[in-house]
């Protein structure tokens, strides 16, 4: 009877310790999600409103380039997800879906990384050109367009850093749910493997 009470008390103490450890991470997680929203929205706004007209070379818009369109869509999706996760963070039932939050944070970080890479490549080609395929740089003619695109990519990168940190925090929260094997269980398993009877204290 005492053994059962002791194991229950130990489990309760372990659970209380988990709550104490996780509390600061909850605050950091909320702060990162709040920061990610304006960064992603600003990236969308900066890119979606980006256009410039040149008397000689005509008009260029973000929608003319697939890498920029991809960045806009991904940032819009991650901003919406961040808002939803902030609103749901106050609900107790959300802890049941920690695995889902973990996977969504990982997916958001990956998508932001791919969108940053795609858009950064377009910006680089616009600024430097590609001599191997005889592409000239265009930022000397569309400087304002290139500048706004660069700002949008930088904001996207900042949102990416937020989600990279969120991925680590959500992973920590998920995997701390698993208790390490107790000493008594380890002794019992070892005794069974050696074929010896288990003597309980």
Swiss-Prot record:
Transmembrane segments: 27-47, 71-91, 99-119, 149-169
GO-annotated cellular components: plasma membrane
Protein localization: Cell membrane
Record field: compositional bias (Polar residues): 180-194
Extracellular side: 48-70, 120-148
Region Disordered, residue ranges: 180-201
Family annotation (PANTHER family): CASP-LIKE PROTEIN 2C1-RELATED (PTHR33573:SF30), CASP-LIKE PROTEIN 4A4 (PTHR33573)
Assembly and oligomerization: Homodimer and heterodimers.
Similarity annotation: Belongs to the Casparian strip membrane proteins (CASP) family.
Protein name from the UniProt record: CASP-like protein 2D1
Species of origin: Oryza sativa subsp. japonica (Rice)
């Amino acid at each position: 009877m005492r053994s059962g009470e002791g194991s229950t008390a130990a489990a309760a103490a372990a659970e209380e310790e988990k709550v104490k450890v996780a509390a600061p991470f909850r605050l950091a997680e909320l702060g990162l999600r709040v920061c990610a929203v304006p960064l992603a929205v600003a990236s969308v706004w900066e890119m979606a409103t980006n256009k410039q007209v040149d008397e000689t070379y005509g008009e260029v818009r973000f929608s003319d380039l697939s890498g920029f369109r991809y960045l806009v869509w991904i940032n819009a999706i991650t901003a919406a997800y961040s808002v939803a996760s902030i609103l749901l963070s106050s609900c107790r039932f959300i802890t049941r879906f920690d695995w889902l939050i973990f996977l969504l944070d990982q997916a958001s970080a990956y998508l932001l990384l791919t969108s940053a890479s795609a858009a950064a490549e377009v910006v680089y080609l616009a600024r430097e050109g590609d001599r191997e395929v005889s592409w000239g740089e265009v930022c000397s003619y569309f400087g304002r367009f290139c500048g706004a695109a660069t700002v949008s990519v930088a904001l996207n990168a900042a949102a990416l850093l937020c989600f990279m940190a969120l991925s680590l925090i959500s992973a920590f929260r998920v995997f701390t749910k698993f208790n390490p094997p107790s000493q008594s269980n380890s002794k019992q398993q070892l005794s069974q493997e050696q074929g010896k009877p288990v003597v309980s204290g």
